[in-house]
């Protein structure tokens, strides 16, 4: 995985902030390397094979096009007549067909020829567009991880799970670790890039309008049932950390303090995880 051209290609794709010339913000490539480091440690803590988690984390953004979700929507519109486009499904396509490393029988590409466990761990949405689960309002989620004509390889690497009676649309533990490592990494590092790039200062969160905007976005994307009091309490806990940096001045001291903050937050989120058996 580490030597694949698909992974190197992520170096030309932005994460959130546009790269500058004198201080480099994260690209999809550097983000994936950081996700792999977080995922490997979390996976080891939870009893996963760290190499499998590492592979999944390095792979998690391979299929995502330039220009982020806007690029994904544009490609989905263009490909609507042939089943659409989805970055996660494209990741599986790259790993099993498009990345030219192993040619199987009848001159058919086997992609990187990864193990079942590795492919299963990369599968964030283990369903096709047709079989996508429904939300509470009855509408289907637009996310899917399998193109219809990639179903044979999906059924191959999920064969053992199916035989064991595992729910067909449940992600394996390694895939859940990959997903969490991604969330932990971007939730901290994207803010770091925004601060280092001069786009925002953490002290702005003291202002009611900015604080409310963060709460509204959190409810829209992640926690629709959360109250303003709960969100305010969570943010206040972060603001009381001894490494919290209200204002980045650009001095060596503030740079070091902010790096300490990001390390502390990554560790805080990673070590708070635990297994829930259902």
PLM features: what roles do these ranges have?
Residues 2-8, 12, 37, 45, ...:
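Sequence-structural signature of the catalytic-core scaffold of metal-dependent phosphohydrolases
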Residues 276-278:
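Conserved small/polar residues in nucleotide/adenosyl-binding loops
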Residues 21-52, 165:
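Alpha-helical phosphate/pyrophosphate-handling elements in metalloenzyme active cores
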Residues 252, 256, 260, 273:
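Secondary-shell segments that build the walls of catalytic and ion/ligand-binding clefts
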């Amino acid at each position: 995985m580490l030597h694949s051209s698909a992974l190197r290609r992520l170096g030309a794709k932005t994460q959130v902030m546009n790269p500058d010339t004198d201080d480099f913000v994260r690209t999809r490539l550097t983000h994936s390397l950081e996700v792999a480091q977080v995922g490997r440690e979390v996976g080891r803590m939870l009893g996963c094979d760290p190499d499998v988690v590492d592979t999944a984390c390095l792979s998690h953004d391979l299929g995502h096009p330039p220009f982020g979700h806007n690029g994904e929507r544009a490609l989905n519109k263009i490909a609507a007549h042939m089943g659409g486009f989805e970055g996660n499904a494209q990741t599986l396509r790259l790993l099993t067909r498009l990345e030219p490393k192993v040619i199987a029988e009848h001159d058919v590409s086997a992609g990187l020829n990864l193990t079942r466990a590795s492919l299963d761990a990369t599968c964030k949405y283990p369903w096709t567009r047709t079989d996508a689960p429904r939300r509470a309002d009855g509408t289907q989620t637009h996310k899917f991880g399998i193109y219809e004509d990639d179903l044979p390889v999906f059924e191959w690497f999920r064969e053992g799970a199916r035989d064991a009676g595992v729910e067909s649309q449940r992600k394996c533990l390694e895939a859940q670790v990959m997903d969490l490592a991604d969330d932990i990494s971007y939730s901290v590092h994207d803010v770091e890039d925004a601060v280092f790039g001069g786009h925002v200062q953490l002290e702005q969160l003291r202002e009611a309008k900015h604080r409310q905007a963060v709460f509204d976005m959190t409810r829209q994307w992640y926690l629709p049932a959360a109250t303003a009091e709960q969100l305010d309490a969570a943010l206040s806990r972060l603001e009381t950390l001894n490494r919290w940096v209200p204002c980045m001045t650009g001095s060596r001291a503030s740079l070091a303090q902010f790096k300490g903050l990001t390390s502390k937050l990554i560790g805080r989120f990673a070590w708070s995880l635990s297994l829930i058996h259902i």
